[in-house]
């Protein structure tokens, strides 16, 4: 285990086209700013920035028109058109760090009481040059024109516009049941192998593709919300739930002769997460979805998506005990041990265990964890929930059987982004769960077996380098001896187009770094235009093949590449004009059973 070299690249991920991941990355809440002495000094001070980069995360709020507020004395007024342009830029590029209401998140607050003291010239310089502490150099990188920089400096001197709330009235107005439960099949009407079906996000098309895991045939393409973030399965495997970044939920009945959306609802303006009840006796009973804006979650009927209970997540931060107006809902999982949903609340640093047995008398266990909670998954026993507080480089462990915090561990890396993580049995350490990192090239292993390996439980046991920084997902399967790590957001095309593969059986645990094999996935896809990025390995049901998305621009060719897990050789390339910006892939069986 050695100290890793941070991963840094000015201007990386500035484009909203790369907004795949959930939530902000910049750790600039601790940034101390001072007005630059002169332009040359400012350029020198701000020419680079840290690996904790901003990631656009509120791209749908950017589409809402709002009226420009009045300007106070000494501040230039903006027309409605100018204000809406600035609002669009802010929500696409700034709100993920600085908050919807500009009250700060991982980035500093930008409310007028603060920005007016700094003044137009300072704001203009800071937006132009950025800072080493995480603020992107929007001007010198070319992401914003000089005119847009001036516009944004002026915009920050005005009062922020609050997006509309989204309550029961709005949800019920959006709620549609296309096929009533009594009109649906009583048994599977198609001959699809549903357990080996893949739901593939076609991000910029606002669709998903359903692909046969054996024949690689695209069985169907269905319209959904914009930029589907995840697909989740009901406990029975019958219903597929998908949620778009625009807050739209589609419920798809896979038993129908032609699987189709049987119910839909919109739960907010920005959203990322959905899950269904899995506790024995409660299978398929409820679904839950969480929103970024408004900050809330809603519990819905599992057969119709009828909204039953909306709960706001606004409240006090766990550490400073200060009120936060917009703590976003990040990952949601269903407990296998209790009739509870596990809800990550990002900015307050709280994990909520929501008991769904009595919605009229809702009981919630609130666990103080760590701020900026993002994604995570269950260990191999399904008892323990391990989640990343990415801006604080921590892993949090929750015992879902006892409903208690178990541990908080620093990963030793920068900005962990595990997806749902990877469970495997290490030759030396026993059962472990792994995460890769966005901010550096490291992979960290935490012990997960308090009974069989108590000395290793809930400790970071090893850290070793993979291909490079910018990883989004790490993956293995119980039937595989390999661990796959992508580097999707790395600026180097050769790295972002490849994956690292580690032989688990060859891991020694003696402090030496395990070797890895590089698979040139993008090269295998035969795509020559753009800079296709390889993202998220997903296994088939049996763990004999692993699929990767080769993600390119909306108007460029993309593909899916299938790798033979035994030989690590190319097995198949899926290309089709309907595969527009494929990103996340979700095998029905693995998703239904939390196999990862």
UniProtKB/Swiss-Prot annotation:
Residues 163-596 are annotated as: D1-heme domain. Heme c binds at residues 46, 94, 97-98, 108, 122. Gene3D superfamilies: C-terminal (heme d1) domain of cytochrome cd1-nitrite reductase, Cytochrome c-like domain. Its cofactor is heme c; heme. Binds 1 heme c group covalently per subunit. One of its GO terms (molecular function) is hydroxylamine reductase activity. The gene is nirS. InterPro entries: Cyt_c-like_dom (IPR009056), Cyt_c-like_dom_sf (IPR036909), Cyt_cd1_C_sf (IPR003143), Haem_d1_sf (IPR011048). It catalyses: nitric oxide + Fe(III)-[cytochrome c] + H2O = Fe(II)-[cytochrome c] + nitrite + 2 H(+); A + NH4(+) + H2O = hydroxylamine + AH2 + H(+). GO terms for cellular component: periplasmic space. Residues 30-76 are annotated as: N-terminal tail. Residues 77-162 form the Cytochrome c domain. Homodimer. This is Nitrite reductase. It is found in: Periplasm. Keywords: Electron transport, Heme, Iron, Metal-binding, Oxidoreductase, Periplasm, Signal, Transport. Its main location: periplasm. Residues 1-29 form the signal peptide.
């Amino acid at each position: 285990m050695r100290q890793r070299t941070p991963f840094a690249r000015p201007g990386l991920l500035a484009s909203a086209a790369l907004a795949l991941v959930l939530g902000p990355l910049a750790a600039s809440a601790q940034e101390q700013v001072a007005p630059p002495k002169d332009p040359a000094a400012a350029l020198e001070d701000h020419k680079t920035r840290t690996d904790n980069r901003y990631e656009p995360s509120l791209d749908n709020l950017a589409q809402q028109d709002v009226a420009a507020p009045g300007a106070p004395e000494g501040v230039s007024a903006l027309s409605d058109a100018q204000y809406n342009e600035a609002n669009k830029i802010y929500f696409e590029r700034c709100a993920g760090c600085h908050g919807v209401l500009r009250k700060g998140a991982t980035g500093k607050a930008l409310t007028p009481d603060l920005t007016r003291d700094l003044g137009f010239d300072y704001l203009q310089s800071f937006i132009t040059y950025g800072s080493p502490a995480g603020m992107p150099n929007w001007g010198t990188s070319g992401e914003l024109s000089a005119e847009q920089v001036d516009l944004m400096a002026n915009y920050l001197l005005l009062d922020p516009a609050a997006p509309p709330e989204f309550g029961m009235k709005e949800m019920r107005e959006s709620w549609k049941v296309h096929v009533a439960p009594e009109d649906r099949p009583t048994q599977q009407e198609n001959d699809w192998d549903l357990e080996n079906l893949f739901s593939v996000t076609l991000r910029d098309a606002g669709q998903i593709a359903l692909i046969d895991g054996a024949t690689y045939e695209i069985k169907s393409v269905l319209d959904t919300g914009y930029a589907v973030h995840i697909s989740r399965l009901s406990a029975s495997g019958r219903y597929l739930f998908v949620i778009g970044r625009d807050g739209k939920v589609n419920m798809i009945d896979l038993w129908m002769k032609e699987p189709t959306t049987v119910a839909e609802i919109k739960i907010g303006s920005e959203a990322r997460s959905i899950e269904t009840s899995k506790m024995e006796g409660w299978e398929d009973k409820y679904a839950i979805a969480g929103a970024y804006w408004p900050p809330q979650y809603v519990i819905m009927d599992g057969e119709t998506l009828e909204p039953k209970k909306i709960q706001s997540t606004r409240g006090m931060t766990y550490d400073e005990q200060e009120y936060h107006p917009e703590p976003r809902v990040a990952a949601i999982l269903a407990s296998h041990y209790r009739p509870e949903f596990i809800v990550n609340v990002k900015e307050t640093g709280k994990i909520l265990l929501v008991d769904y047995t009595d919605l009229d008398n809702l009981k919630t266990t609130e666990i103080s964890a760590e701020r900026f909670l993002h994604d995570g998954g269950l260990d191999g026993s399904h008892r323990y929930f391990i989640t990343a507080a990415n801006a604080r480089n921590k892993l949090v462990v929750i015992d879902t059987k006892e409903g208690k915090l178990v541990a908080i561990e620093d990963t030793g890396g920068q900005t962990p982004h595990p997806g749902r993580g990877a469970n495997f049995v290490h030759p030396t350490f026993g059962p472990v769960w792994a995460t890769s990192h966005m901010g550096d090239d490291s992979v960290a292993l935490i012990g997960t077996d308090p009974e069989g390996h108590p000395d290793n439980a809930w400790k970071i046991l090893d850290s070793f380098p993979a291909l490079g920084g910018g990883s989004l997902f790490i993956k293995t399967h119980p039937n595989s001896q390999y661990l796959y790590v992508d580097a999707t957001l790395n600026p180097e095309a050769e790295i972002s187009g490849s994956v690292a593969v580690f032989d688990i059986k060859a891991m020694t645990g003696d402090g030496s770094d395990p070797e890895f094999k590089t698979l040139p996935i993008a090269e295998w896809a035969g795509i020559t235009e753009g800079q296709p990025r390889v993202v998220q390995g997903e296994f088939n049901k049996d763990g004999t093949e692993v699929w990767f998305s080769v993600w390119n621009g909306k108007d460029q060719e993309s593909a899916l590449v299938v790798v033979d897990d035994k030989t690590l050789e190319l097995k198949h390339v899926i290309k089709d004009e309907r595969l527009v910006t494929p990103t996340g892939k979700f095998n029905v069986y693995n998703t239904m059973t939390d196999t990862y």
